[in-house]
Amino acid sequence: MKKIILLNLIFLSSLYSQDYYYEKYAPFDENIKSPEEFLGYPIGEMHTRHDLIVSYMTYLSNVSDKADMFSYATSYEGRKLIYLIVSSPEKINNIEKIRKSHLSYIRPDDENYIQSDKPSDFPVIINLGYNVHGNEPSSSEAAMLTAYTLISSKSKEVEKYLQNSIVLIDPTINPDGRDRHTQWVNSYKGSPLVDDPQDAEHNEYWPGGRTNHYWFDLNRDVLLGIHPETRGKIEFHHNWYPNVTMDFHEMGTNSTYFFVPWKTHAAKDPVIPQENYEYFERLFGEFFAKGLDEIGSMYFSKEAFDKTYPGYHSSYGDLMGGIGMLFEQASSRGHKQVTQFGEITFPFTIRNQYVSGMNTVKASVEMKDELMKYQQRFFASALTDADKKRIKGYSFKMGKDRNKTKAFIDKLMIHDISVLKDNDNFFVPTKQKNYRTVRSIFETNTEFRDSVFYDASAWSIANFYDIDYNSSSKDSQGVELDNLDNLFTVNKIDESEYAYLINSVDYNIPAVINSLVNSDIIVSTAFKPFTINTSSGIIPFDYGSLVIPVSL
């Protein structure tokens, strides 16, 4: 009798957890394990480690013909960053052909450019990006629920989604930060749960899980492209050019849920068509509101956050000709916490993210044709707008610090920007498909629609690298760079019996010092400038220049 009661309780607990999240999309394929069945605990009972999230996504790609999985980067701590492609079996079998057709439809520079008036022939590409801030963890749990629903649900509604879309699920953009946070909250979780905001579970020690291994905010790195997680994601964007990019976040515990539109009078990126903000985001917002109304969750929009800085993950989706948006869920910062509105639990935050993610797919499918037309107009207008402008490009020289110039050109090339080279002169034409990204990198904006905005107010990468560049009203000649392998010739170093000198003006000096010290080579540094007669003549050396003695 006790065993029967226990089994009934287990069954009811499992049934409740499933009904709480995705009852709406039943029935499900019994041959595919739910996240709870795979992990061994209900979603929201624990914070799930990144390796288990990857394992579940791998499992789904192995058992279903509606999914395929790819790795796009590896974090500093060796964790794989992956995305799961979900669509109908027919589309999964032809995914590479569909990807290339999508690019041919939207990009006028493509050799197979399709001037088609039938966007209905193409699926909408939806990029769902989760957990760029590691201690905003609800979204990665929701990613597993979303993947399971799209793959396992037998509902006609979900079938329609898969017939008309390619859904790219990136469950953990910042795996190192997530696991740092996961370790903290699971370690300090109490039984019973402690909802006191002062409890250790809800108060990570610095630096917390927000940032990556080197404590960098990956949601400020998209233009800079410094870290491997971001560089892989940038390449992902240019492989797919999604129509919709959704970025999932959390905010302060004493809040509710935010979705677009942004602040009504907020500053917006001046290079992005207003249609993005004033039309599409309004329509998406109506879908999000309806979805949260159905489950009785509170929300707000138009009162916070803005689109000033083009280096957020959501903003980069705009530069791809898509609609980039974000969700902000009030965080439980653990498993349960008391707020001014009552208790907030981890499962509650997960459900809101899950419902909003599914409504992103729904809205994208409903607006598919409009989104496809907008993206095609976006890139076509890039070329015509560039023709109308006085500035035809930006020029700069190799300069004294060749490695710094090389690093800057690397940033241009990872953003799929064309760079022309003529001896030691470089030219970046504005007339190219990523015209708006070129403007974002070179232009210096000093006027904004609002005096109050979220954070970053300056982002010119050209100025970040201190590049001495000029705008040009004339087109320039040159050969387009394919790679950086032979950007400049490295001078041969003559053998010395006394010492070697390295001027500190070079961008790669820190890397050189690291390499020399790790090789047990003695290195001295200059505390003031000096000149010296070398085999190449009299040469000035600056502060911090390196002296490597051959013998002492």
Predicted regions and their residues:
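Acidic, His- and aromatic-enriched active-site or binding-groove loops in soluble protein domains
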Residues: 187-214, 219, 265-282, 322-323
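Active-site-proximal loop/turn and secondary-structure-junction residues that shape catalytic pockets
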Residues: 173-175, 250-252, 331
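Sec-dependent N-terminal signal peptides
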Residues: 3-13
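Proline-aspartate-enriched helix->loop->beta-strand connector
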Residues: 237-251
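Carboxylate/His-rich catalytic cores and anion/metal-binding grooves
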Residues: 147, 164-190
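Substrate-binding cleft of carbohydrate-active enzyme catalytic domains
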Residues: 179, 203, 209-213, 225-237
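Active-site neighborhood of phospho(di)ester-bond hydrolases with catalytic His/Asp-centered motifs
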Residues: 128-130, 170-172, 245-248
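Intrinsic-disorder/low-complexity accessory segments
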Residues: 18-137, 144-165, 220, 226-228, ...
